[in-house]
Amino acid sequence: MLNGENVDSRIMGKVATRASSKGVKSTLGTRGALENISNVARNNLQAGAKKELVKAKRGMTKSKATSSLQSVMGLNVEPMEKAKPQSPEPMDMSEINSALEAFSQNLLEGVEDIDKNDFDNPQLCSEFVNDIYQYMRKLEREFKVRTDYMTIQEITERMRSILIDWLVQVHLRFHLLQETLFLTIQILDRYLEVQPVSKNKLQLVGVTSMLIAAKYEEMYPPEIGDFVYITDNAYTKAQIRSMECNILRRLDFSLGKPLCIHFLRRNSKAGGVDGQKHTMAKYLMELTLPEYAFVPYDPSEIAAAALCLSSKILEPDMEWGTTLVHYSAYSEDHLMPIVQKMALVLKNAPTAKFQAVRKKYSSAKFMNVSTISALTSSTVMDLADQMC
């Protein structure tokens, strides 16, 4: 093994010899930590050596596919002709502008553009909102529930009404979103359409439908244990989980059917209605939930009919004008049979056995709309009598 001192002396001797051969004065010495690590003093170059370092400047270029530089002197490069940039031909915008103008006039002829002030708010999607609602109308037709699904069931229409009246109370107890309630009933009806359910399992299907809807709509949905408690331990957590899997499989995991409340918001904006009319329309829509007779109608039809009846109750002179016809996609003549059915349900509400919805909308939170005197007006009675 070599001695450390001998190795150091040999290395230092070689450095000194190389420095002297290049005309550099060796100045080896001690240095502090993290200081100059060179053993050669760079400022002691002789004047002659400095002159020798001055060389002719060479043309430089970037090498292909790298950022390093290479000399191009001595290379035989054929000069290339510069390609003259071709300016694009000017686009004739007259036809496009005329087409857009014609489309706009056709869309808005006699119809107020209710989205013209929403372009600065990206959340309102004003550029695509009409396409979105058109797609939603397509979806509601795809998810349409059969009108005769009770024929395959052991349960009856009355049992369905009892269940939904109880679900309205559960929904209110848990302080859930409006969308969650409507989605719960949609899931319930779609499942009953394809799967026979026994009487003792109907409540299980109901609470599980609400659990699924809450997971879909809510930021903080209730836990399974909450639904076990609300059923007074009639079902276990395992039973609810099993039913959840069963419902999702039978519905092919498709839960995106549009809801009445989605269309009502659009219609209320088109009609420029106030909070009371909008809340009254929500009350009318919820009154239809326990009624099996309203299952055949699309959510967009129920929403439009609810707003139409609400307007007739609170503002009899208000017309279902061109703007409302355009954005709701329904004329008043089309809605009138549904409006008359709603009026009959509204007329019978004070004496009906199921009072959950009426009690809910009697609170100040919902403007006490279920208790106002206008609900017993001649307008409501005349519309209801046409169904008798």
UniProtKB/Swiss-Prot annotation:
Keyword field contains Cell division: yes
InterPro entries with a match to the protein in the record: Cyclin, Cyclin-like_dom, Cyclin-like_sf, Cyclin_A/B-like, Cyclin_C-dom, Cyclin_N, Cyclins_cyclin-box
Region forming the signal peptide: none
Record's keyword terms, sorted: Cell cycle, Cell division, Cyclin, Mitosis
Gene Ontology MF terms: cyclin-dependent protein serine/threonine kinase regulator activity
Pfam families per record: Cyclin_C, Cyclin_N
GO biological process terms, semicolon-separated: cell division; mitotic cell cycle phase transition
PROSITE patterns: CYCLINS
Complex and partners: Interacts with the CDK1 protein kinase to form a serine/threonine kinase holoenzyme complex also known as maturation promoting factor (MPF). The cyclin subunit imparts substrate specificity to the complex.
Protein task: Essential for the control of the cell cycle at the G2/M (mitosis) transition.
Annotated family: Belongs to the cyclin family. Cyclin AB subfamily.
Protein name from the UniProt record: G2/mitotic-specific cyclin-B
